[in-house]
């Protein structure tokens, strides 16, 4: 039976992951069978087991399944356990091993590709779902001075902060208090609100200072609304999630195939191959 790989999400037709892993496979001379599988939340667990029965040995997991994927894993990396979220699955025998590579992917993109020094920065994280949980630990480890999390459901923000285990550096605040939080050198949108094409981000301009970098973990059309606000607010840098996607994919590829591929080729190919993506940097 041929080893199979996939990305699970809902929706997932827009995903660039199959193209990315096909390119990585060609670079490394490895035949890769990787496809996108759309599963509604209530169908995820059964769909994942059907995938395993059909030769599935590795998978990426995107919204809204990252926390559900965490729950099915028998073993977890330390960073996945801390995040309470999984985006990379590896089949070991008849069980799943889980990791989260989003955080290290984001840090690699911001530091290596965009030349940012994250040390000493005050950061605002918007959202507290699986995507937010997957990047928060790595950003703290990269030297963020203070992490402030806001979410429309404050209990979710509190849960994320508790999971970080760093009460002196990571705090939650109410959405209604955004105007009173001061300014930040890094603002990260980890919500999926931008997938609603009619959405308009209306965040206080007081969040921005002369050094602010605004990052949307989404890419393509889903990142347009937040990054439009960031440009209007005159953020110094605006970054979408394409680079993070490529870097986290390379980390997943390493776990599945034992080699970490070079990422610049596929990043530039994706960036130049789409009119929407071409304007994001």
UniProtKB/Swiss-Prot annotation:
Residue stretches in coiled coil: none
UniProt xrefs under InterPro entries: Aminoacid_DH-like_N_sf (IPR046346), NAD(P)-bd_dom_sf (IPR036291), SDH_C (IPR041121), Shikimate_DH (IPR011342), Shikimate_DH-bd_N (IPR013708), Shikimate_DH_fam (IPR022893), Shikm_DH/Glu-tRNA_Rdtase (IPR006151)
Any one GO MF annotation of this record: NADP binding
Keywords on record: Amino-acid biosynthesis, Aromatic amino acid biosynthesis, NADP, Oxidoreductase
Functional pathway: Metabolic intermediate biosynthesis; chorismate biosynthesis; chorismate from D-erythrose 4-phosphate and phosphoenolpyruvate: step 4/7
Gene Ontology CC annotations of this record: cytosol
Catalyzed reactions: shikimate + NADP(+) = 3-dehydroshikimate + NADPH + H(+)
GO biological-process terms attached to the record: amino acid biosynthetic process; aromatic amino acid family biosynthetic process; chorismate biosynthetic process; shikimate metabolic process
Subunit relationships: Homodimer.
The protein's name: Shikimate dehydrogenase (NADP(+))
Organism: Stenotrophomonas maltophilia (strain K279a)
């Amino acid at each position: 039976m041929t080893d199979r790989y996939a990305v699970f999400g809902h929706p997932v037709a827009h995903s660039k992951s199959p193209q990315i892993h096909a390119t990585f496979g060609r670079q490394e001379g490895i035949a890769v069978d990787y496809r996108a599988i759309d599963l509604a939340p209530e169908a995820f667990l059964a769909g994942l087991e059907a995938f395993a029965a059909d030769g599935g040995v590795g998978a990426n997991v995107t919204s809204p399944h990252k926390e559900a994927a965490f729950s099915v894993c028998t073993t977890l990396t330390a960073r996945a356990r801390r995040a309470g979220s999984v985006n990379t699955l590896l089949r070991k025998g008849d069980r799943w091993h889980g990791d989260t590579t989003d955080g290290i992917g984001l840090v690699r993109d911001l530091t290596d590709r965009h030349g940012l020094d994250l040390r000493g920065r005050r950061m605002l994280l918007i959202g507290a779902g699986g995507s937010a949980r997957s990047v928060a630990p790595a950003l703290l480890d990269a030297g963020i001075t203070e992490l402030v999390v806001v979410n429309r459901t404050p209990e979710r923000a509190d849960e994320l902060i508790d999971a970080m285990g760093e009460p002196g550096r990571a705090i939650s605040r109410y959405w209604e208090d955004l105007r009173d939080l001061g300014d930040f050198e890094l603002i990260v949108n980890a919500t999926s609100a931008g997938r609603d094409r009619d959405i308009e981000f209306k965040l206080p301009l007081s969040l921005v200072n002369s050094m602010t970098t605004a990052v949307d973990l989404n890419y393509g059309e889903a990142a347009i609304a937040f990054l439009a606000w960031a440009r209007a607010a005159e953020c110094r840098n605006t970054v979408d999630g394409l680079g993070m996607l490529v870097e986290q994919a390379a980390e997943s590829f390493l776990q599945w195939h034992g080699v970490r591929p070079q990422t610049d080729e596929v990043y530039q190919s994706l960036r130049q191959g789409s009119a929407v993506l071409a304007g994001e940097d």
